[in-house]
Amino acid sequence: MDALVSLRSAVRAELEKFSAGDLILLGVSGGADSLALAFTTQIEAKKLAIRTIAIVVDHQIQTGSADIAKKVCEILNSGKIESQIVKVKVEVTDGVEASARRARYEAFEKIAKDMNASALFLGHTKDDQAETVLLGLARGSGARSLSGMATRNGIYVRPFLRNSRAETLKACKELGLEPWNDPHNEDLSFLRVRARKKVLPIMESELGPGIADALVRSAQLLRDDADTLDYLANQFWSEDKSLEIAALEKLPKAIRSRVLRLALAEKGALQLSAEQIGQVEALISNWKGQGEVSLPAGVKVSRISGRLTLSK
């Protein structure tokens, strides 16, 4: 199938879930993926009377970033795509890449709320998905992390997760667009770039073609499994919030750990590591009279009189 037709079809499938008059924001960096997203979405959204506005985030990290953002908006304007530049201040706390991503998504969520947008479309492709899964494997992540990015997650929609980076590049060429090549995408000091430029090509060479597709298939299978486990954990937690040890002991570990995350999240302890959950789990499955477990947000977990007690 022609690349442009394939991308338009992918976008159309997601747009049809919205209504005429809805506002869809588009995250645009100026790269091939996001430009292809912006132009294909604009084409299909018009047919459905859906409004679109492209959001160009200026992280103010690279020299000349303001000029780059303006250039991206000029490209968008050439296609009669409304655009806005949003400047963010990146506080580097856990690496430039992760810190920039956090600042970008915080900006996305704020502007989506301020503009009452129905969704924000992002241009991640199956190549990005494969990289995400590979990095999760390198970290020893669990099923939820290894399931990669969801097509729909809150306000975020990723129509291109079944499409390749090669398709977005080809679509840009067909549309006469010249994408901006972010120098950071060539910088091997970034882990994701090493996965893209070095690890995946070696895997393709040594194990045969189709590695990216295989990783994406595995991610979807893991997502299906993780969704089922999440459903069962939510069902248990909605029916029994006593945190009695006897009841928790009967649960399979994969469900029990999810129940613990739900309970702790209600107290404000979010995004806990596997090690932190393991410390709480030990109060159930490896009880030796140990003391309370201290977690982020000031949450403390103790085993008292046959049940877990959560306090702040």
Summary of predicted features, one role per range:
Residues 1-200:
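Core alpha/beta nucleotide-donor-binding catalytic domains of modification enzymes
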